[in-house]
């Protein structure tokens, strides 16, 4: 479930292009080598063992194995250390992602109502929207459709300062029994903060969304995108473009 708040905005997750290599921490270019080359270097074997013992999806494991096999041929090359640093940093991040970890939803409407009421007075529209979502989830569970993908709603909180936009978010997470993560937008000026940097950079890092998943060690947390109206003027348009990608129901299925 995604949440975001703003003090001044009124009501109103593009696909990654592998050819241009503006890929995030999950992205690995498709290899032209079909055969996985043998790995003999001890450091590369350690990295491969780290990947094999992790919960990284098999397709990604296979691609990383290909990269490691190619890198093994460069052990005596001057470019080896730089390439090793890149792949080691990449593997360090992808193995931290909680690929198969989710929290079990607590679909007790009475309990959820009590939690929401105990933290905030009023805000009935928000509370009813959350309870409506939980009701649909509970109904699907009773019909044996619990494992069916249910797109999480995006709630847009608009209001004056001090009306509970930020504080209601952790209450919603508690009511659902999910982990909670907050991403502050105040002063943000670079869309790469959200999208992540290309793995080809030595200091590359994933975006704040992926970092939030790593921090809470869950793939289905409630994420609050806080104070989106306070991004810098210079980066506003590009950051809002990334938000469209993240919040578009047709593109954010991986964050549900």
Enumerate the predicted regions with their spans.
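Conserved catalytic/switch belt of AAA+ P-loop NTPases
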Residues: 225-256
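Glycine/charge-rich, flexible interdomain linkers and switch-proximal surface loops
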Residues: 106-109, 113, 134, 140-163
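Extended, charged alpha-helical coiled-coil/arm scaffolds that mediate oligomerization and mechanical coupling
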Residues: 2-140
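Walker A/P-loop
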Residues: 146-185, 214-215
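AAA+/P-loop NTPase substrate/partner-engagement loops
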Residues: 175-205, 212, 232
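The Walker A (P-loop) glycine that initiates the GxxxxGKT/S ATP-binding motif of P-loop NTPases
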Residues: 157-159, 196, 227
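Conserved alpha-helical scaffold flanking the Walker A/P-loop in AAA+ ATPase domains
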Residues: 200-224, 256
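Short loop/turn elements that form and flank the Walker-type P-loop nucleotide-binding site
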Residues: 150-153, 176, 195, 203, ...
């Amino acid at each position: 479930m995604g949440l975001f708040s703003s003090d001044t905005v009124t009501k109103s997750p593009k696909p990654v292009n592998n050819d241009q290599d503006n890929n995030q921490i999950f992205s690995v270019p498709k290899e032209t080598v079909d055969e996985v080359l043998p790995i003999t270097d001890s450091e590369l074997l350690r990295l491969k063992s780290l990947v094999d013992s992790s919960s990284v999806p098999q397709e990604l494991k296979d691609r990383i194995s290909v990269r490691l096999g190619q890198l093994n041929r460069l052990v005596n090359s001057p470019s080896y250390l730089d390439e090793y640093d890149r792949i080691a940093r990449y593997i360090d991040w992808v193995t931290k992602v909680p690929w198969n970890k989710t929290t079990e939803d607590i679909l007790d409407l009475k309990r959820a109502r009590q939690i929401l009421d105990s933290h905030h007075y009023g805000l009935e529209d928000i509370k009813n929207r959350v309870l409506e979502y939980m009701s649909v989830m509970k109904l699907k569970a009773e019909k044996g459709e619990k494992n069916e993908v249910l797109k999480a709603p995006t709630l847009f909180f608009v209001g004056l300062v001090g009306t509970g936009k930020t504080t209601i978010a952790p209450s919603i997470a508690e009511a659902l029994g999910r982990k909670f993560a907050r991403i502050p937008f105040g002063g943000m000026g670079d869309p790469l903060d959200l999208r992540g940097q290309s793995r080809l950079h030595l200091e590359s890092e994933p975006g704040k969304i992926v970092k939030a998943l790593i921090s809470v060690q869950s793939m289905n947390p409630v994420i609050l995108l806080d104070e989106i109206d306070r991004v810098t003027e210079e980066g506003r348009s590009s950051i809002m473009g990334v938000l469209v990608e993240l919040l578009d129901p047709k593109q954010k299925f991986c964050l549900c």
